[in-house]
């Protein structure tokens, strides 16, 4: 296949700090404990390849519009916590609900999406939890570099 993906395994220092920033700036993306880039992908095996567009957002330039402010107001009763990433039974149940409602292929578990058993996590991974009272209603994972972050699973 033309333009097959290019993968890198983690080195001794993993993909943290400036190393992650450099890969992100070059169009690389995390897949489990590897990092890869590609210019084309397919949605189904044997089907025509389509171009990939890697998007980056300068967070400092984001401005909330009226719709975003209205949504934020409706969500004031929710609690939002940012912490070191961890996969719990509660999170796996939320992922299972998500997986049952999407019409594309997804990993069997949240753990499977984010990790490989062969390596320790080479990223400085964090998570955001959103709760309605004690109930986990949303979660997102991201990796820290030195100056950049990469959203992984939301």
Model regions and ranges:
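A conserved beta-strand-loop-helix scaffold within acyl/acetyltransferase catalytic domains
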Residues: 34-41, 63, 70-154
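Acyl-donor-binding surface of acyltransferase catalytic domains
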Residues: 1-79
């Amino acid at each position: 296949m033309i333009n097959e993906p290019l993968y890198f395994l983690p080195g001794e220092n993993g993909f943290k700090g400036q190393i992650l920033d450099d890969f992100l700036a070059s169009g690389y993306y995390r897949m489990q404990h590897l990092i890869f880039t590609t210019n084309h992908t397919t949605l189904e095996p044997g089907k025509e390849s389509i171009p990939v567009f890697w998007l980056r957002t300068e967070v400092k330039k984001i401005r909330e519009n009226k719709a975003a402010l209205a949504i934020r107001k409706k969500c004031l009763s929710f609690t939002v916590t940012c912490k070191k990433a961890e996969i719990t039974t509660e999170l796996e149940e939320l992922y299972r609900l998500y997986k049952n409602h999407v019409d594309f292929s997804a990993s069997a578990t949240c753990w499977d999406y984010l990790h490989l058993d062969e390596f320790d996590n080479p990223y400085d991974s964090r998570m955001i939890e959103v709760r309605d009272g004690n109930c986990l209603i949303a979660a997102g994972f991201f990796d820290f570099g030195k100056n950049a972050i990469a959203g992984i699973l939301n």
